[in-house]
Every structure is written in structure tokens, then in C-alpha cells.
Regions:
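Short, hydrophobic/aromatic-rich segments at coil-to-beta transitions
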Residues: 41-47
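Active-site/substrate-binding loop(s) of hydrolase catalytic cores
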Residues: 52-53, 70-82, 86-207, 223, ...
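Composition-driven, intrinsically disordered low-complexity tracts enriched in small residues
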Residues: 26-40, 271-272
Length: 272
């Protein structure tokens, strides 16, 4: 049943304050299992940001660039699978986590932001909420495929990400999606957006949400922080080679970052 649109400044303010209260604690990396995949030993921190509706951990990996004495570079957060049926770009983040040492950027990776949706191969989380309509910025009450939740910041995944971004305060956030095939340039930093599009081989365009772009993560972040969050849309079937081999160095190039040429020591860890 359709519900009337409702926005409440007080509710939004309370949701923001509640979500940013407290700092998430770091946890040790999980132990290896027989189904583990190779990962380079270049992870500085493994942080559990929170849990999904079904109790699955939402994990971020902080890549270690301390060996690069020249410059730390910008702080960058890469996020994949906000929508669980848009899983291909997750391979980009897993490749960055598992390859050679990364220099010139302070990099955080969140490969599985919506682990319940990923497991079920659904856009929304286990409550049936579109996480990219649940943020307390221009939130409205939406139904159907874009169900926005009972209130702004109602979902544990949303609150976990809000706390994390409020703690890290990155210079840049790239949120990877499918299948619209383009990078939105209708934002506060169009020149940087065009740079991203060029580096990734995607069209620079205006992504029209059809009138339902309310409560988005990028909108919330860009309103509250000095940094810049950008949505990157790959196509429906970008191809495994593009995701695993081509895109990771392209992403680093955006920030003038690079990898070591020497193969790293590797260990086995479970995939996210």
C-alpha cells in the first residue's frame, strides 16, 4: 500500500546524531578456511563496522601504505554491493585487497556493504529496504523496489556506514553500482567526476533516478562532510577480466596511486 510522503527535520537530526555517536571497534582478521582465497599481507586493519539484519558482519579493510615514505595521499573509501544484486564490482575491491602493496593513497575497502542482499541476490536488505534510500538527507517515505524504511537511518547497515564515514572522514568515496553504465557529473565536483569516468572507461553522464533519488548515501555524505562521494555505475555484465584485472589499476590511477612491482607475500583468508 502506498504511504504519504513524509519528511521530518527532527527525525533526520536525531538519526544523524545517533548514527555518528560512538566509534566502531577494530577486530582481528578472521582465520583461514579451506575455501579461503589468496590475499596479500598488506592489510593494516580489519574493522567490523557493524552487523546486517541477519547478523552478518560488515567488514572494512584498511590497506597498509606506511612503507611509502613520500606521501600518504588522500583518504579514499571504496564501497561495493550496497545493492546485493550488483555484485560484479566487488571483484575490484577484492583484487585491490589481494594484490601488491598500494602506495600514494590511504585506502579503505568495503566489498560487501549489504551482505544479506548479496547472499540472497536481492537489491534490498533483509528488511526489504533499499539502503540507498535510507539515509537521513532528503529522505521520503517510498514503497516498492525503492522502499526507504520506516524512518531515516532505520537500518543497521545504514547506521554502521554512517558511523564509519563519520570516523574516517574520507576525502573521497566511490560507491560502485550496476547496471546504468556511467559516472554522474551532475554534482558538486563535475571535473573530478569526469576524471573518474575517463579513468574507468565509462561515459560521463547525468544519472536520472526517475524522481526517487531521496535518502542516498552520496547525497548524505556530500551534505555533511568536506569530502566528495560519487556513484560509479558499471553495466549489467562488465566481465570478470575487467573487474579483476583492468579496473583495479584504473581506480588507483584516479588518485595518482600505484602498486609495488614486487609480488607480495600472501596468506589465505575467507572471502567477504
Amino acid at each position: 500500500m502506498s504511504r504519504p510522503v513524509r519528511t521530518t527535520a527532527a527525525v533526520v537530526a536525531l538519526a544523524l546524531a545517533a548514527a555518528l555517536a560512538g566509534v566502531p571497534q577494530s577486530t582481528a582478521a578472521p582465520s583461514a578456511t579451506p575455501s579461503a582465497t589468496p590475499r596479500a599481507n598488506h592489510v593494516l586493519e580489519t574493522r567490523v563496522l557493524g552487523e546486517s539484519v541477519r547478523g552478518r558482519p560488515i567488514t572494512a579493510w584498511h590497506m597498509d601504505n606506511r612503507a611509502d615514505g613520500k606521501r600518504k595521499g588522500p583518504t579514499v573509501v571504496l564501497i561495493a554491493t550496497m545493492h546485493g544484486n550488483e555484485g560484479a564490482p566487488r571483484q575490484i575491491l577484492r583484487s585491490l585487497r589481494g594484490g601488491q602493496a598500494i602506495h600514494g593513497v590511504d585506502l579503505w575497502l568495503v566489498p560487501a556493504y549489504n551482505p544479506d542482499g548479496l547472499a540472497a541476490h536481492t537489491r534490498r536488505n533483509a528488511h526489504g529496504v533499499d539502503l540507498n534510500r535510507n539515509y537521513p538527507y532528503h529522505w521520503v517515505d517510498l514503497d516498492g523496489n525503492y522502499e526507504s524504511g520506516s524512518r531515516p537511518g532505520s537500518e543497521p547497515e545504514t547506521r554502521a556506514m554512517m558511523r564509519f564515514l563519520g570516523d574516517v572522514r574520507p576525502d573521497y568515496v566511490l560507491s560502485f553500482h550496476q547496471p546504468l553504465h556511467g559516472v554522474d557529473t551532475d554534482n558538486k565536483r563535475p571535473a573530478f567526476s569526469r576524471r573518474v569516468a575517463h579513468a574507468l572507461g565509462l561515459p560521463a553522464t547525468t544519472l536520472d533516478c526517475g524522481g526517487v533519488c531521496h535518502g542516498t548515501m552520496t547525497g548524505w555524505f556530500n551534505h555533511h562532510f568536506k569530502g566528495f562521494a560519487l556513484t560509479v555505475e558499471y553495466g549489467a555484465r562488465p566481465g570478470s577480466q575487467r573487474m579483476r584485472e583492468d579496473a583495479p589499476p584504473q581506480v588507483l590511477k584516479i588518485f595518482d596511486a600505484f602498486r609495488s612491482a614486487k609480488p607480495p607475500k600472501q596468506e589465505l583468508i575467507p572471502p567477504p
